[in-house]
Structure formats: C-alpha cells, structure tokens
Amino acid sequence: MVLVFSDDKKLTLEMLSKGSELAKKLDKKLTAVVIGKSDDALAKEYIAHGADKVFIAETDIESFKAEEYTELLENVIKETGAETVLIGSNKNGKELAPRLAGRLNTGCVTDCMDLYLKDKKLTTERIVYSGNAIAVEQFNSKPQIATIPSKVFDPLPRDDKHTGEVVKKKFDVEKSASKILKIQEMKSEGVNVEDAEIIVSCGRGFKNKDDIKLVDNLAEILKGRTIGCSRPISADLKWLSEDHWIGLSGHKVKPKLYIAAGIS
C-alpha cells in the first residue's frame, strides 16, 4: 500500500498524483490519511483525486504536536501495512517524517523532487548542495518514507466517477509531555506567491530598501503580478515579510513568468 499524509489539503492533492502513479506501478492501493474529526467531504475529494481509500484516524488531538502525530501515524501504518509513505514537506511534515522513521527504524528521504521505480526499487531524486547537484537514492528498508514539497507535482483532474473506500477508526495516543501555552498567528500581508502566475523577485543586489520600489513599479505594469524575494531580503534585512520569501528554505513557486532581479 502507498500511504499519503499532509495536514495541508493542497499538498495532499499534489502528492496523490504521484502516489497514484507509484501505486499503479507497484500494483498497490493508494490511501490518503486524515487525522482528526471525520470529514466526509474531504474524503470524497481525495477519492475524486485518485485515492482508493481514505483512512480517517479519529482523535481528540486539537493541534499539531509532533510526538502525538508520530505515534498516531505509526499506528496507522501498522494498521494498514503501508510499505511506501509520502508525507508533505511543510513545517509540520519536516518534523514528523524523521521522527516517524526513527520510530519505525527505517529510512527517510526528504524534499523529493521525483520518485520512480528503478530495478524494482523505489528511487528518489532531491536537490543537494544549494541546487548544484541532484542526489539519486534508493531505499533498503521498509516502510520507505519520503517527504515531498509543494508545487512539485500537479494534482490529477477531479474525477467524481472514481470510487473508493472510507475507513474510520478511533485512536487514543499518549499525551505529549509538552504543552502549547499560546498560538499566535503570524502577521500576513495577504501575499500568496505560491499561487502567483507572474512573480518579480528581488535579491541582495539591491543596496537600499527604497530600491525595491523599482521592482514594485515593474510588478505594477504586469497584471496579476506578485513581488517575491530571496532569503537575505526577508530573513536578514527584513525589507520584506516571509510571505514574499522564495527558495529552498522559503516558498516553492511555479509561475508562468518569473523575473529575478539582483539575485545571483
């Protein structure tokens, strides 16, 4: 069985596309996991986008805690007998996947840009050395766990004729030793670079914050435009918020047009 999980619906839909391809080649079923309250509408959507089964792990967990989610997913994997596990590489997934691999004493490849079968083995490709090389790796243990960033694969077209099974099971997990005291939403400028079709991006080549107006002026000329930036502009200089941050450690984008100014 190929199992897919992310707490990000859009990322799950993207992973279901690659998961469906792998499941067919492995002659296995594709299962999407939902954690929390039963959500029949979400289950139906996942099935329409390629899932053969949706496993709803019902639990009273109110918010993400890595320890609790790790135990819960470990139980789901053992329950389903999944041999291939795809986890969304967002902030929660990056913490969850290695913990899960440790609990299951198995391998984990992170931020995969492609997955395929070679010599009957699951093979992964990921970017290393700041984008200067691609590492090609194979698993020698099961279950095999891989994380996938957003915007790597396109979701399958919705097919409401595709049928699937919905399984619901309640789980009790050991309460985490840590306690969430407060959740504070980060201030957002309402910028969504991940869905932008046209992006004008600036980097360290800009000497002054006021120079970013040049990028803003160009962006205004282009309809449907969004301003992006590299890590130094957001993380170091704080000239733009993290909403604009694009790159390996920032947002993953797939626009129709990308203009990079002052970025090496």
PLM regions and their residue ranges:
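N-terminal glycine-rich FAD/FM-binding segment characteristic of electron-transfer flavoproteins
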Residues: M1-S264
